[in-house]
Amino acid sequence: MSRIGKRPIEIPSGVKVEFSDSVLTIEGPKGKLSRQVMDGVSLEITPSSIEVKRADDGLKARSAHGLTRTLVNNMVVGVTKGFERALEINGVGYRAEAKGDVLNLSLGYSHPINYALPAGIIVEVDKMTKLVVKGIDKELVGQTAAKIRSFRGPEPYKGKGIKYADEKILRKAGKTGKK
């Protein structure tokens, strides 16, 4: 039995859970999320908790058991608290600006980068060098942060580029040169 999968998920007050035709819909104060539940896994919903059960002990069902529980828990946390990922921009002249649902980035290229944010994602810019990606879908927040980071990843010599706030960049020594 999956150690993660067998733990029940508590439903906080103000969260509404619906499950029909293998589609789970969770609605809370921050928004609404839906997800298709995998075959071989079923959900038992009570007014205070959700339990993930598997149909048999086959490899596919065992693999999906813990994963499904974690995905459902992330949905519950997302509609109640939300998720965020912080990014930092390092480099002379590197800056970011959020205008509605478009993020404008100047990263040392010959052209600015205008990145259209996915629906449900908000980016807050602080002092033009610190970004916070926020949303209710953990997967989408992570993908958006990774996409923004990919425009100019941190380089190991001077540390210029976009990095996660909690990321440590391994720095390399430059050329020593001939003497």
UniProtKB/Swiss-Prot annotation:
GO terms for biological process: cytoplasmic translation. Keywords: Ribonucleoprotein, Ribosomal protein, RNA-binding, rRNA-binding. GO terms for molecular function: rRNA binding; structural constituent of ribosome. PROSITE patterns: RIBOSOMAL_L6_1 (PS00525). It holds the Pfam family Ribosomal_L6. InterPro entries: Ribosomal_uL6-like, Ribosomal_uL6-like_a/b-dom_sf, Ribosomal_uL6_a/b-dom, Ribosomal_uL6_bac-type, Ribosomal_uL6_CS. The keyword Transport does not apply. The keyword rRNA-binding applies. GO terms for cellular component: cytosolic large ribosomal subunit. This protein binds to the 23S rRNA, and is important in its secondary structure. It is located near the subunit interface in the base of the L7/L12 stalk, and near the tRNA binding site of the peptidyltransferase center. Part of the 50S ribosomal subunit. Belongs to the universal ribosomal protein uL6 family. NCBIfam families: L6_bact. This is Large ribosomal subunit protein uL6.
